[in-house]
């Protein structure tokens, strides 16, 4: 019986992958990763520049900074133009003389490709730009960015737990054949049905835990974990933290909780982030990765 118990524990326990001699190298690797993450976040078109989200309705709506527009954007020309949503297409028509561009050109009319495309159509004027987003339930909206947004210019940086090699875990991987489907809630009140190729099982503090990663696309080459834990809403952002992992190999998957990072919603009220599903709310304090943003008001 004792041997059986030991074998069972060994089959699910998470393995620490960093030896004591390699701690310094590993710490530098994580610190470099964090620096790169910070630079992406702070980029002029990064998540810190998000200043608005305008949901569209079928039909034609005017857009500009003047109060008589259907959609008012503070830094836009007074009467920028109009947006028409008809069937599956959304089209932008710019008024003459606005100085606005469509994908960097002086065109005045174009179909707006949404963010499901690798390069959505971008309408820009001054420091401000917007593009179309498409969400579950047939919702379409304009995501508005301003490189001079106070969320970007007044950014306070990101606090994080000290790098802890014990939180880089090799978990057992159990593949699902066929893949399962998981309903992922989001902050705008809809559900995204996403494929789950399997589950990761690991042990921490003598207890076994499971996590369900999702695939973000049919050709995804990484697993996407949306997690919460006992630090959520206290030391870390309450809605979720994100982790990407390489695809499983030989029945194992590496989950590096030191790379757990805040979703865009931790920094702005205008993002459409997924929330951690009940299946991924861990009953353990994950004292690794990013902490709650000090500058957040939500």
Segments and roles (model prediction):
Residues 103-116, 208-259:
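An exposed acidic His-Trp-rich patch
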Residues 49-50, 55-122, 244:
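Forkhead-associated
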Residues 17-19, 95-96, 101-171, 179, ...:
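C-terminal boundary/linker segments immediately following FHA domains
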Residues 3-14:
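Bacterial N-terminal signal peptides
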């Amino acid at each position: 019986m004792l041997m059986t118990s030991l074998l069972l524990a060994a089959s699910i326990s998470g393995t620490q992958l960093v030896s004591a001699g390699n701690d310094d190298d590993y710490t530098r690797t994580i610190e470099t990763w964090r620096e790169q993450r910070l630079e992406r976040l702070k980029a002029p078109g990064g998540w810190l520049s998000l200043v608005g989200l305008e949901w569209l309705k079928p039909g034609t709506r005017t857009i500009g900074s003047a109060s008589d527009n259907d959609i008012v954007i503070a830094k836009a020309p007074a009467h920028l133009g109009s947006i028409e949503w008809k069937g599956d297409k959304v089209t932008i028509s710019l008024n003459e003389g606005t100085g606005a561009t469509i994908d960097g050109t002086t065109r005045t009319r174009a179909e707006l490709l949404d963010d499901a495309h690798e390069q959505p159509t971008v309408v820009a004027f001054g420091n401000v730009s917007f593009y179309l987003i498409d969400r579950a339930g047939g919702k379409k909206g304009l995501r508005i960015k301003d490189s001079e947004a106070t969320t970007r210019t007044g950014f306070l940086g990101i606090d994080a737990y000290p790098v802890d090699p014990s939180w880089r875990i090799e978990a057992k991987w159990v593949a699902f054949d066929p893949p399962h489907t998981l309903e992922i809630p989001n902050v705008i009140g809809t559900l995204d049905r996403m494929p789950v190729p399997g589950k990761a099982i690991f042990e921490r503090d003598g207890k076994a835990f499971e996590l369900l990663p999702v695939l973000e696309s049919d050709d995804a080459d990484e697993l996407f974990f949306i997690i919460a834990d006992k630090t959520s809403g206290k030391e870390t952002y309450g809605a979720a933290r994100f982790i990407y992992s390489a695809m499983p190999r030989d029945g194992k998957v590496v989950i590096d909780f030191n790379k757990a990072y805040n979703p865009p919603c931790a920094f702005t009220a205008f993002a459409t982030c997924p929330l951690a599903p009940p299946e991924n709310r861990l009953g353990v304090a994950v004292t690794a990765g990013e902490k709650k943003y000090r500058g957040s008001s939500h």
